[in-house]
């Protein structure tokens, strides 16, 4: 028997019926009383996003939990995620009242709210939207700290041990008649954040807001202490609520979810090694069924795999109709990633405690708020967008004639979302050594998957230089062309049809478009890229013993056949090519 069960009377069904009828009468009375004079529903804005911080309060989301306690706590955190989306970014005009319920609306399953812990008539019971008092309590505390005028606030009638109710700093809510309302004579802004383990509430506003002393304690008599435990752990198995509570909230301790996009062999191996039975993998498509190698992730036995098939097919269809380069292509690609992320967000179970996410989906999931209250790792596939755009700007400054280096820049809100999400991530996982160096100790370096070596062929005539990319500025095409024009006696072959249009630097060079198999007869692979995220052909060349000349930005592993230059530079590149080709040229002369 639970140690507290003998201290309490067993709740009866008639009490619940009476409570239901009483609350409906109070709700009706509030609705009628406010006809024509309800507080306004406020909108989100960015006018005060840089305003001074007036107050900030934090509260723990999670505590040490038993499997029996976990489901309702996970439901509470999910309810807070939904509520945070409703309140974050609200800006309230001077003199206007902020009403908790007017802003959030009724908590229903249709809106995504789940069963959480709710204090009701001396019991902690499962209730749709349960746990939102943690948010209302923090809102009350920051309003007090910022000196806002409290219009309406109610304390709990029972005290949860260790809670803010012991200091009369709580604020209970119950649709719609038990509300929290406050206002200021100057404009102010609400910001809500769920970190891995905390709920954070901030108020921003114009300095000079009226300061108000905290109100006197609102309780006429000390609240009664609440016995510990909820419907799942209180020990009162004879209670009418107990059977349904146990049936609907099976003991659990959470699981991890892997939110994946295009397959990298390095990430596939890492995810398989770090999965456990009960975890879930989300992929765009069943790569084996659809014969799509880029989606052929290999989930271990015991892992549930789900797919965003319709979203992935729409993305694939849209990509086929896009030009090879340009702003339109990048915008459509981002929209496709956003749709995949939205689908994954709907599939995430509230009991998921940890997420592993492909980087391209990260900013969209962050903006959706589903990473709040969870720890997460990021599979780093590329430079952060902000850093990537900085590098493109640097390349454009060096080659202002380029038609591609400045064709697209992401919106600031997307950059900010990725910046915030990367800062909040637990681990940044990548095989790319340049990315790892950029993030320093936060990076978790995993080894590149080296390909099977290819059989080599001896070329006749001039040495063959292999450029494994299209003739684009970001791949170092301008630097390579200038290096070749400096007097290097070699044939150049490149991959891909995309180019710089009227600014094509390869015009006039002894070069031709090649195929992947041309690498087998190459004297060297050249990749002087400003940006290169997945240097697969360079890895194949190294594995096959072919010299590779590349920038550090390519992130390649140390190798005896790797010759690196610090950054794209035509002079340094020409010298390196000449040095690597010298033995080949000597052999040809002999």
Please state what every model-predicted region is.
Residues 234-311, 485:
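N-terminal subdomain of nucleotide-sugar transferases
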Residues 316-327, 378-413:
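Acceptor-binding helix/loop patch of EC 2.4 sugar-transfer enzymes
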Residues 562-571, 578-584:
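Conserved acidic donor-binding segment of nucleotide-sugar-dependent glycosyltransferases
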Residues 547-550:
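Short hydrophobic beta-strand element within catalytic cores of glycosyltransferases
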Residues 530:
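Aromatic "clamp/platform" in nucleotide-sugar-dependent glycosyltransferases that forms part
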Residues 454-475, 481-485:
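Conserved donor-binding/catalytic core segment of Leloir-type glycosyltransferases
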Residues 407-456:
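Donor nucleotide-sugar binding/catalytic pocket of nucleotide-sugar-dependent glycosyltransferases
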Residues 339-347, 384, 397-427:
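Membrane-proximal helix-turn-helix segments that form the acceptor-binding/catalytic region
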